[in-house]
């Protein structure tokens, strides 16, 4: 029950403490038609608050007017009753329409085959190198110096014919006249059967 006091009030008046607004409202109990009021019937009278009252700051603004129910109307209660409740999220979604559906998945392109044509594995034929052909020495006994030096057999000897001495010996061998050796009698009578030394005179 709210705290009440009659201290300093006229007969029939009572002061009742309002916990919300931290102040007294006054009621004339001698008049059944009287309404509760916030103003003290005695001007300049200040009634101290109850001993166990909370001294926190009261709500801002003056207290509302009292009705016949002898209970002060609170502005917060009136405001909460008048304010409509917020619409649920489902109602808001229906009001604005359903959310757009995502785009259907795009058809993928067929994967292209990755291949390369087979390259011919061949190399152009390399020309075969001819093997050097060494000519056989000529049967003629007399040759010119240029013929001997140009002979691949001679040039192939390399180190055997290197040096001036070897060349000099070769020159003398080729410049030497040919010699014919006769065998005594030789059972041919020195070719007498062919006209009496016809062939022999050519050699002497």
UniProtKB/Swiss-Prot annotation:
Coiled coil: none annotated. Keywords: Cytoplasm, Nucleus. It is found in: Cytoplasm; Nucleus. Residues 32-117 are annotated as: Disordered. Its main location: cytoplasm. The keyword Nucleus applies. GO terms for cellular component: cytosol; nucleus. Residues 7-43 form the WW domain. Residues 66-100, 108-117 have a biased composition (Low complexity). This is WW domain-containing protein C11B10.08. The lineage of its organism: Eukaryota, Fungi, Dikarya, Ascomycota, Taphrinomycotina.
């Amino acid at each position: 029950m709210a705290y009440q006091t009659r201290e300093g009030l006229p007969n029939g008046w009572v002061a009742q403490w309002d916990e919300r607004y931290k102040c007294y409202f006054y009621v004339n109990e001698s008049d059944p038609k009287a309404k509760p009021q916030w103003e003290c019937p005695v001007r300049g009278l200040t009634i101290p608050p109850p001993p166990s009252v909370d001294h926190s700051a009261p709500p801002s603004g003056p207290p509302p007017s009292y009705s016949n129910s002898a209970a002060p109307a609170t502005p917060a209660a009136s405001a909460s009753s008048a304010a409509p409740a917020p619409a649920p999220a489902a109602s808001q979604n229906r009001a604005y329409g359903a959310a757009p559906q995502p785009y259907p998945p795009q058809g993928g392109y067929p994967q292209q085959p990755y291949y390369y044509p087979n390259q011919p594995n061949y190399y152009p034929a390399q020309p075969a190198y001819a093997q050097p052909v060494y000519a056989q020495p000529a049967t003629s006994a007399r040759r010119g110096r240029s013929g001997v030096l140009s002979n691949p057999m001679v040039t192939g000897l390399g180190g055997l014919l290197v040096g001036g001495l070897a060349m000099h010996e070769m020159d003398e061998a080729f410049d030497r006249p040919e010699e014919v050796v006769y065998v005594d009698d030789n059972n041919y009578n020195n070719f007498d059967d062919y006209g009496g030394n016809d062939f022999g005179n050519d050699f002497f």
